[in-house]
A protein has these predicted regions:
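TRNA-recognition modules of translation machinery and tRNA-sensing kinases, especially anticodon-binding
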Residues: 2-303
């Protein structure tokens, strides 16, 4: 077991002992990827959520909304989730165990998330990676598996196909016309939402990092691309951020958000400003500044 996995195991064990998180439905055997928040965890989650909502709502032109967790199929077809919201799954020939292909090749590639099915198959085959359950190194070809939980709205025969939302963004985008009217047809404005999301993970692990039901908190901010924003970065003149760009464009840098915006390291001033405000929130809730970094997605990681 690696040091990072050992630390995660110790942390998860401590959280369980102290009533922060507990395995859900444990007396019936439990379900991987589902957790209860215990007496301490429930209070912590509520306080963190309230702090987050207050942090962004105090901005003035950001409002709170609450969208349904059941989403019609047509919405998720338009967003690309029905066709593309997939992880690759590898099935063991011997025991029929199913595992995420990118998890199997961790340690054999620096960024397994970006690999294609053929690349995953090659790494698994070339390294004779054993099945975590039965140790047999024989696998079927990696196949895409859609991660959304499907359901139906209405009677089963005439019901409308829908999904439990995999993220909160779609409901927020659907509300844009109403929000635009609320702000008297003027940009910029934003909306925040917190709530449940659902993903049918192939092989949940990493404690609370990969869950089948989880809590999300999201902000969407809408701007006029033709209007140059005027953000004041003076508050962060003495604060340097750890910025990790796409490796194609250079290595990590340390600089203030204002300088990063001026030098086009962060390509839009509004993005830089929200990164700075996010940094404020994280520090306010107790995260040490030295532990915070902002990493740009690589081109192959983009949704």
């Amino acid at each position: 077991m690696s040091d990072s996995h050992a630390r995660l195991e110790r942390l998860t064990s401590m959280l369980r002992r102290r009533g922060v998180i507990l395995p859900a439905f444990e007396i019936h055997g439990g379900v991987a990827g589902l957790f209860d928040f215990g007496p301490i965890g429930g209070r912590l989650r509520r306080r963190l959520k309230n702090a987050w909502l207050e942090h962004w709502s105090s901005h003035g032109n950001i409002v709170e909304i609450d969208s349904p967790t059941i989403t019609p199929e047509s919405v998720l077809i338009a967003s690309g989730h029905v066709g593309e919201f997939n992880d690759y799954m590898s099935e063991c020939i011997a025991c029929n165990g199913a595992f995420r292909s990118d998890h199997l090749v961790e340690g054999f590639h620096p960024n397994p998330d970006i690999l294609t099915a053929d690349e995953l198959n090659s790494i698994i085959s070339e390294n004779s990676i054993p099945c975590p359950s039965c140790q047999t190194p024989e696998w079927k070809s990696a196949q895409p598996m859609n991660l959304m939980f499907e359901t139906r709205i209405g009677a089963m025969k005439g019901g409308r196909t829908a999904y439990m939302r995999p993220e909160t963004a779609q409901g927020m985008f659907m509300l844009f016309p109403a929000l635009y009217r609320h702000f008297r047809n003027r940009l910029p404005f934003g909306a925040v939402q917190s709530g449940k999301g659902y993903r049918n993970e192939i092989s949940p692990r990493q404690g609370m990092i990969r869950l089948r039901e989880f809590n999300m908190a999201e902000l969407e901010y809408f701007i006029d691309p033709e209007t140059k924003p005027a953000h004041d970065f003076s508050k962060w003149n003495d604060v340097t951020f750890s910025l990790v760009p796409d490796p194609e464009f250079g290595g990590p840098v340390e600089m203030t958000p204002g300088k990063a915006s001026a030098e086009n390291i962060i390509r839009h001033p509004t993005v830089a400003w929200f990164m700075a405000r996010t940094w404020d929130f994280l520090v306010d809730v107790g995260i040490h500044p030295s532990k915070i970094r902002f990493r740009q997605h690589e081109g192959t990681e983009m949704a």
